[in-house]
Every structure is written in structure tokens, then in C-alpha cells.
Amino acid sequence: MSANISYLVNPPTEVGSSIPADTEHAISVTLPTWKSNVGYEEGDPNVTTKMKSGYPRFFISAHVKDCISIIKKFPEIEILKLKDYDMFLYPSLSVAKQSAAFLESKGPIDSAEVIIYDATKGLRKHLDSIDRNRKYTEEIHIPQVYSVLFPSKYFGIAKQFWQHTGDGISSRRAAAFLHSYKKIQSISEFLVAQRSISHLKSKSRSRYASHPDLQALNTWMTNEGNQANDEMEDVSLYLEERYGRNLDLSLATAAKLVLRRRIAGTLKDEVDLQKALPKEGSQYLREVKGLSHDDVFLFPTGMSAIYNTHRILRLVLDDSRKSVCFGFCYVDTLKILQKWGSGCYFYGLGNDEQLDEFEKRLESGEKVMALFCEFPSNPLLNSPDLVRIRKLADSYDFAVVVDETIGNFVNVEVLPLADVVVSSLTKIFSGDSNVMGGSMVLNPSSRYYSRIKDAMKALYEDLLYDEDALTLERNSRDFAERSQVINHNAETICNLLYQNPKIKTLYYPKYNTSKEHFEACRRENGGYGGLLSVVFHNPEDARQFYDKIQVAKGPSLGTNFTLASPYAILAHYQELDWAGENGIDRNLVRVSVGMEPSEHLKNVFINALS
């Protein structure tokens, strides 16, 4: 069995272990039983204290926690003598200000209680104080990090912004900040020792060779130097093994250009980032005239793409109008539409009957700013009637934003029917479950194109950390091929589940009542995607199936390996009745099918159902 196959078919099983196993920047966590999922939601220490990783918008990673601990000890922070204060970390001043504004708008908090601190500037100040001429620290690059400090009693409100927007710093950015800090500290100690040696030399040159303090300092400096060299060799080795090259700004810039071209559908073949990039080719995937990589914008997460799309639309359209969430979209999408702007109308079922209701609302004179939907939706895999929605948008003047994460542009073509398409690159585009990212694609044929494009030129910040971009580029090179394998495997499993008497409902685009709407956008060689959900006749069967199935079990989707979760428990534990009213059974099990050998997967599901 090859190493790759072994990695796919031997999932981690220990509560709290990372998914993938032993991965520094893993974005999922093992919750192997139904009980452990409930325990996580209820804060059971038997679960929470064992968590080595978690989904990054819900779980503060160890690297980020370490950054927070260090920044709290910076002189500029310590001098404030703050008591009972917490902080979140962001990659730009603009995002930090947005976080502060959200805090002040949602809680009874005085603006003076919210402090924005440039942690990068603070670390540079320390660097300059020890090595002003940069003799020893010339090559140290400190990534941009801002901290937003606030009284601990407002932690819940502050976390809402961090979670919903997805604009917190990534674990790789945090790790780089920590590495810079440790390097500067080591150099600082080295220079102190060097000055001590110089002082001792000047005081007693004749006793230099035998002075015990001086000998100790020389020994310390030698050890520190060797340790520093070893650390740098380890880092270089890691980068060479992981990327086959050293990371630098020029490669990151090239990687981001490749990503944008790949997402625009104008780059089919792999490229060498160290060589000149080929000119942008013609469309081979997207079917929108005039589309180029200049219409693609990258973000640190998928939710950041959605949040910023909504933010830009509020600036260029009529912000006094509400938005529409059509269909049961991912929880944070709805929260963004509800908590920013003028609110939203929620059509949770997202079916033709609710589209009739929406049309009647428009006919009555109600005006809306934008309609947000997923194609298909998560976790019910329903497909809205995009053709009809486009006609309504043209008639009643509102923007259409489609999240294509689940369908992905290998399988479906939704951009011609949308003004903006967003996606989480964290999912199948990456596949490796070790990096976050998001994208926004503008439709050049949209009536709002010029306004949105001008606003993006003025306000867009590239906050996708360079190393994250390099990781995404590497992971996504075989995106199209992986999608086809996963399409095949998912259909194979659905054919198996569809015939099983224990299954009450199978949710999959091929079998859903909204199939005709999916087919209207499906590419000629496209499949139905890798995500499916099942509801059992007997809730106990759902729990037994989840506990027994031998696949990775935790949050997220779109992974190269099969990943299962009791979706309603994880995403809506505090609002299960409300979720049920919108079609989400509390015992629903969601499965993201991976690239394991088909026969292996069939046996895994047969055993879990037996």
C-alpha cells in the first residue's frame, strides 16, 4: 500500500487529534463519536482539553494563542496595566478598526476601552533598540499583526466578528511572527553577551584566557550560535521538503497570480513559479466573455470573501435595502447578512415555493440590495433556480451572489447567472485540509461590474498570507483531476445508500427534487460533487452509523479523504429546533467523500450500516 493510500484509509481516531494527523496547520479535529461532538458543544473538559486543533474560525490555534501571550508582555501593553483584558489578532489596521467598530456597535462598551495596537511595530521597535543598523537582523521579516484589546467581559461579542468575518490572522502568519520574535530575542541575548565580553576584555586583557565569567560567556555564545544555525537548517530543510524551494516575496506574488488565473479558468497546466509565467490563456472552464484574473480577488478565508462582498455591495448599492439569504446557507453567511447592514430576509428552504413568495414580495414594491445563495446548499444539497433568480434580479434591480464552494467550477457554471461568485478555497480547491483561503470572482457582464470593480480597486487589501498562498497554489495544481475522482466516489456511495432501508432521506444533487436546477448549471463533463447528507428512520441508527464508520470524523468538508460529521449538532446545537423548522434534521449525518479506492469506501459504508 502506498504512503498516499495509507494516509487516506487510516484516519486518526483519538479525540482531539488533528485532521490530518500530525499536521501543524491542520484545520479539522477528530471527534470520533456522537457523544464527543455533544461534549465539544457543551464544553465538556474530557473533550475540549484534548483538542490539539480545530476549525480555525472557531478554535484559536496554539500559534495564535502563543502570539497573544507574547504581545501581552510587550512594554507598550504592560505599561497600560490592563486588568481582565483579552485580544484578537488581525492582519491589517483596517480589519482591526472594523473589529473595534463592531464591538462598539454591539455592546455597551466605551470606545476608550477598545485599544488597537500595532504588534509588528512594537516588535520592530524592540529590534531597532538592539540592532539599529541591522547588522545581525537584516533578514528578519516580521509579518503584519494588529491586536484589538478589549475588556474580557466582551469576549463573546469580539469573537463574533473574528468568527463571522474570517479575517483573523492565520496560523502560518502567527507562526512566522513567533519565529521572528524568538529570533530577535536570541539575537538580543547574544548581543548582551557580546557587550559583556567586550567589557571584560577592556577591564582585564591579561586575564582574558582564564577569566571564568568570560569563558562562560564564550561557551554560551558558541552554543547559542550553534543552536541558531541548527534552527535555520531545520527551517530550510522543512521548506525544501515541503515546497522544493525557498519562500520569498517574488514566489508568493507569482503563486497568487497563478491562483487567480486558475480560479478564473484561464490556466489549465501546472507552472513553475521560479520561471516566467505564461501569458493568460483563453477560457477553458468559465464561460463568461471578458473574464480575466483581474476579476478574481483572494481572501484569507471563504467567509472573508463573503463578508467583504457584502461590505462592498453595501458601499456601491443602496445600503438601506435588506439582503436575502435564499436557502439554508452556512451559518456564518446568515449571521453576516443579519448583523451588518439593514438585515436580511431568510428563505431557509430555498425551494420553488419560497421563490414564489420572494417574487410576490418584490411585486408588492419591496426592494432588496442583494440575494445570497449556495449552489448547491450545505448540508441539504438543494439547488436554487438560478435562471429564475437571474431574471428577477434583472427585473427588480438587485445583485446575485452565489457561493459555489460545494458545486465547484469543475462541475457547475454559475458565474453567467451571478454578479459575484464566492468560494472557500479551504475545501476541495485545496483538498489537503491544511490551509485556509477564499475567493471572489466578478462577472464582467454584470450591470454592477464597474461600480464593484472600482470599489475593490480602492478598498481591497491582499490579506492572504504569503506562505498560505504558496501552500494553496501547491495543493490546487491537480484540483480538476481530484474533483473528478471525488465525483465518482460520491456517486458510488450514494448509489449504495439510496437502496438501504435504514436511510429515510439521502440528500445529494442527483437525487434531490431540485435536480433540474442543478442540471441547468452542470457542465457537460461535470459531476454532482463530493458532499452528501443522510437522515435515518431511527435516530439511534444515525448515532451507531457515525460511531462505527471508519473515516475521519470532524468539521470541514472538501477534503481529499472522506470526512463525516453530525452537522446539526456541530453547527446548530443551540438552535436545533430552528434548524429543524428549516429542514435540518437534528440527527443528520453529513459526509464529504474523498479519494480513497472505491471498493475500500464501499466496504467502509457497508460495515457502518450493518
Swiss-Prot record:
InterPro entries: Cys/Met-Metab_PyrdxlP-dep_enz, Cys_met_metab_PP, PyrdxlP-dep_Trfase, PyrdxlP-dep_Trfase_major, PyrdxlP-dep_Trfase_small, Trans-sulfuration_enzymes. Keywords: Amino-acid biosynthesis, Cytoplasm, Methionine biosynthesis, Nucleus, Pyridoxal phosphate, Transferase. The modification N6-(pyridoxal phosphate)lysine is found at residue 427. Its EC number is 2.5.1.48. Pfam families: Cys_Met_Meta_PP. GO terms for biological process: cysteine metabolic process; methionine biosynthetic process; transsulfuration. Its cofactor is pyridoxal 5'-phosphate. It catalyses: O-succinyl-L-homoserine + L-cysteine = L,L-cystathionine + succinate + H(+). The keyword Transcription regulation does not apply. The keyword Cell membrane does not apply. Pathway: Amino-acid biosynthesis; L-methionine biosynthesis via de novo pathway; L-cystathionine from O-succinyl-L-homoserine: step 1/1. Its main location: cytoplasm. It is found in: Cytoplasm; Nucleus. It is an enzyme of class 2 (transferase). One of its GO terms (cellular component) is nucleus. One of its GO terms (molecular function) is pyridoxal phosphate binding. Catalyzes the formation of L-cystathionine from O-succinyl-L-homoserine (OSHS) and L-cysteine, via a gamma-replacement reaction. In the absence of thiol, catalyzes gamma-elimination to form 2-oxobutanoate, succinate and ammonia. Belongs to the trans-sulfuration enzymes family. MET7 subfamily. This is Probable cystathionine gamma-synthase.
